[in-house]
Amino acid sequence: MAKDVPPPDVNGKTVLLKPNILSPKKPEFAICTHPVVVGAAVKLFLELGAKKVLVGESPATANPTSAAKATGMYNQIIDNGGEWVEFSDQIVVECPEGKLVKSFEFASPFADADIIVSLSKLKTHQFMSYTGAMKN
């Protein structure tokens, strides 16, 4: 596939991976992005020359770091050379030309990244057939 779809140029850049951690459940429950997928993505982007690979999430129902550890994701990130970040610090991005919204609040790691990659979990939803990356 790499020959058909060339990888992005990440050389010397900071990459932020955004997996989906719904709750602190082990991989066999298939609730979160599989930790092996996250670890492989960290490894791949570093092999492609990324300066740094950050991985972060902000689950609504659990402490982010505890949830990442419970899913096995945290160890995969660290073991493959990545860095876990929490989305606790916020920044405000001003949009003075906006018609309805004049500013947006984002987790600061998004501003620290040159490239953002969504590693969403394919799953169903009570109001949708499937969510894909819609909620990530």
What are these regions (language model features)?
Residues 1-136:
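N-terminal and secondary-structure boundary signal
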